[in-house]
């Protein structure tokens, strides 16, 4: 059996370098106000996450077969530290992007399942504690982001409620204005109708009076003649 660690490590290192470049470009664009798509960066992160799984499996194989590969405790410790640092850096990049890590963030430090955890050195325990603290901090950042999002949604909902209330008041005012205008129009139409009728009656009376005067004048002329 060949030691698979260094081949997978080389792939992980190259992929991490690519992720760093894409991440720096993404952050520079976002800081300048340009919302550029990050599809390529997301793909690179997903690919690196899969490679990290293979790398952790390679570490486990190495620890279970350390004598076969001729590995001492210092080499195994170095491999575990490399994986932990790479894992932490990747999770930090994802959190700064505002996205959830590609793989669920565990609250337990990275360890290998070979029954040898009881024999870890103090330095290994320190690395594990540091990794666990990093994970707790990442979870706090994620929770803060969730709380901020919920607060923003509540604020927007309250603002929308106020705007809807104002619009309802405006509609009520408009309805009242329309009703008042209609009432004034009805009164005006009634007055105009009454005036028209009165004017018509007055003109008829004048015509009758004129006709009577003309008839009287004709009668007088007939009698005189």
Curated annotation (Swiss-Prot):
Keywords: Coiled coil, Endosome, Golgi apparatus, Membrane, Protein transport, Transmembrane, Transmembrane helix, Transport. It holds the Pfam family SNARE. The keyword Transport applies. It is a single-pass type IV membrane protein. It is found in: Golgi apparatus, trans-Golgi network membrane; Endosome membrane. GO terms for molecular function: SNAP receptor activity; SNARE binding. SUPFAM superfamilies: SNARE fusion complex, t-snare proteins. Its main location: Golgi. Residues 133-195 form the t-SNARE coiled-coil homology domain. The chain crosses the membrane at residues 205-225. Residues 38-68 form a coiled coil. The keyword Lyase does not apply. This is t-SNARE affecting a late Golgi compartment protein 1. It comes from Schizosaccharomyces pombe (strain 972 / ATCC 24843). The gene is tlg1.
């Amino acid at each position: 059996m060949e030691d698979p660690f260094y081949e997978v490590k080389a792939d992980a290192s190259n992929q991490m370098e690519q992720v760093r470049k894409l991440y720096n470009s993404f952050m520079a664009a976002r800081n300048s106000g340009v919302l550029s798509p990050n599809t390529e960066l997301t793909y690179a992160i997903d690919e690196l996450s899969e490679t990290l799984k293979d790398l952790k499996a390679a570490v486990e194989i190495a620890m279970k077969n350390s004598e076969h590969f001729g590995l001492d405790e210092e080499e195994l410790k170095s491999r575990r530290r490399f994986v932990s640092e790479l894992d932490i850096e990747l999770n930090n990049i994802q959190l700064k992007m505002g996205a959830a890590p590609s793989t669920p963030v565990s609250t337990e430090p990275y360890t290998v399942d070979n029954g040898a955890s009881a024999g870890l050195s103090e330095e290994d325990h320190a690395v594990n504690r540091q990794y666990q603290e990093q994970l707790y901090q990442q979870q706090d950042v994620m929770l803060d982001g969730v709380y901020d999002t919920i607060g923003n949604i509540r604020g927007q909902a309250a603002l929308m409620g106020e705007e809807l209330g104002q619009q309802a008041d405006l509609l009520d005012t408009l309805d009242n204005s329309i009703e008042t205008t209609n009432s004034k129009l009805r009164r005006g139409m009634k007055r105009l109708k009454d005036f028209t009728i009165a004017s018509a009656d007055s003109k008829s009376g004048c015509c009758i009076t004129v006709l009577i005067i003309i008839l009287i004048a004709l009668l007088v002329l007939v009698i005189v003649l």
